[in-house]
Amino acid sequence: MSELSDEASEPELLNRSLSMWHGLGTQVSGEELDVPLDLHTAASIGQYEVVKECVQRRELDLNKKNGGGWTPLMYASYIGHDTIVHLLLEAGVSVNVPTPEGQTPLMLASSCGNESIAYFLLQQGAELEMKDIQGWTALFHCTSAGHQHMVRFLLDSGANANVREPICGFTPLMEAAAAGHEIIVQYFLNHGVKVDARDHSGATARMLAKQYGHMKIVALMDTYSPSLPKSLYRSPEKYEDLSSSDESCPAPQRQRPCRKKGVSIHEGPRALARITGIGLGGRAPRPRYEQAPPRGYVTFNSSGENPLEEEGLCCRDVTSPINERDVESSSSSSSREEHAFCANLGPVQSSSSSEGLARAQGLSSEASVESNEDSDHACKSSARKQAKSYMKTKNPDSQWPPRAATDREGFLAESSPQTQRAPYSGPQDLAALLEQIGCLKYLQVFEEQDVDLRIFLTLTESDLKEIGITLFGPKRKMTSAIARWHSSARPPGDALELAYADRLEAEMQELAIQLHKRCEEVEATRGQVCQEQELRAVVESCLLEQDRAREDLQARLRETWALARDAALVLDQLRACQAELSSRVRQDQPPGAATLGLAVPPADSKGWQASLQAMSLPELSGALEDRVREMGQALCLVTQSLEKLQVLNGKKWRET
């Protein structure tokens, strides 16, 4: 195969056969370089034409398992090649053949969220309630991986939502609650699952959610089951009754060693790491020979031979990195010898099936595979396209995905002390900085705004946009340069780790801006809380003063009531004197002399009237004057008491 160019697209790469590097100057014919794809590899990397050719020849057993115990349908179902799955199903392959772990193609598709493939498999008679060696059904696998749409699809297809796995006694609802999948828990509750079911330790789904700090799920389950007894909310001796404030506390780590999760997309890179001898740290051994293979070639050698001996190279079956049991296989039914990948892999132009070969550059194998277990299969292709388009703009000489540089420590550790750069001091003016990042043409824009280097280093992305830097590329370069200046990092370059560091620095700067805003919001909230506390203290003091004023008012009212009662008694006496005086005037007869010199009668009304009849007219007149004087004094006291009540009540008494 001719050397691949940087402009080669992914379909062009997939349509070419695999090739090997036989050393510099070695003359090898094109026929010897061609390595045909077997059916399992073609199904795993999405080679529809190769699979179609194998199906049409009718010479191969489509249900045959490879050394790892996987069929072509399993690979296509796991990766998500729906066209190949449809082709194999039309050819009549078996849909319920399990792997050595007991996982059917439906379980593999469910673990990766491939909803369309699960639909095809169910249409062809796939058993929905079939269990693997752990006792997990397809519903368990998609629930554990967090694929919401797949869970809803299986529930609508009639999956048993109350099934239990035998190890811990978990139901799918318990698995979702313990893992924190809130939307999946919502689906199960809407489906009507048993929320009061307990596992082998006596814990319910609500207890598991509370134990691992998923308080939103706890509140969600409380809204769906408000009448549950409190005995279900607390397990004796094992689970404490946590308050709602526990959500702010760090949740315990979920460690479940007794239970194994379903198939993960990360198993592919791990398997490839064991094949190639490269650890998950992303560091490959350094080459011990001077000859380096050209771009686009992969070296092969026998595991027991010296890497320098190129005569031992031969073809082999391509081992898929997805099924880790492929590594354990020591023999194959084919006549070709079994060889392992050389530990010193050269640069490889990889497709979706060989992205794990990025470990040859010292990069992380897990990061080289575009995986998102918490999202559905529809999001994978768009994320992969965005990653590739981003790398074309950041580093046109490299075709590795941007996520392949997540293991920065392993990559940077490979640089020798002689190649490390000197400490970066930074440019002295704005023109030098802009020239360094390739944005010198924008110097005039900053000069018009009177922006020097000191002001430039304080600008944010929104400030640059306001000044007039509207293009995304220059704006990102400037924000990365500002972030690098503040972090005293090295200047930007063309290396892959520097491109990744630029993106991280920009994200860190944006996070710092958001943190500053949040701190300001927290300070404003604290000020509001202080104001509310002061207002509360003022209101409490006002209430205390009102209570004291009310008590004084009640005391004054009691005194006024007593004075009014005395005034009423004097008024009755005055009326009696007036009545007697009126009767005497009408009779026009002088009273007897025996009544002269009588003392003031008692205050009793009956005795008062009897004594008035015995008084003379002058005495009666004097008694009337005395009663009028007492009446005036009583009214004066009542008026004074009412005036005191006016002050306490806050308004004039006579105004009412």
UniProtKB/Swiss-Prot annotation:
Effect in UniProt of substituting I455E: Decreased homooligomerization. No effect on interaction with ANKS6
Annotated segments matching region Disordered: 235-265, 277-312, 346-425
Residue numbers bearing the Phosphothreonine modification: T319
Coiled coil: 501-526
Region: Interaction with NEK7, residue numbers: 1-422
Quaternary assembly: Homooligomer. Interacts (via SAM domain) with ANKS6 (via SAM domain). Interacts with BICC1. Interacts with NPHP1. Interacts with NEK8. Interacts with HIF1AN. Interacts with NEK7; this interaction alters the subcellular distribution of NEK7 by preventing its nuclear translocation.
Annotated phenotype, changing K477E: Decreased homooligomerization. Decreased interaction with ANKS6
Ranges of the ANK repeats in the UniProt entry: 34-64, 68-97, 101-130, 134-163, 168-197, 201-220
Function comment: May be involved in vasopressin signaling in the kidney.
Subcellular location: Cell projection, Cilium; Cytoplasm
Provenance organism: Homo sapiens
Keywords of the record: ANK repeat, Cell projection, Coiled coil, Cytoplasm, Hydroxylation, Phosphoprotein, Repeat, Ubl conjugation
Pfam families reported for this sequence: Ank_2, Ank_4, SAM_1
InterPro entries: ANKS3_SAM, Ankyrin_rpt, Ankyrin_rpt-contain_sf, SAM, SAM/pointed_sf
Domain remarks in the Swiss-Prot or TrEMBL record: The SAM domain mediates homooligomerization.
Name recorded for this polypeptide: Ankyrin repeat and SAM domain-containing protein 3
GO cellular component: cilium; cytoplasm
Residues covered by the SAM domain: 425-488
Posttranslational mods: Hydroxylated at Asn-96, most probably by HIF1AN.
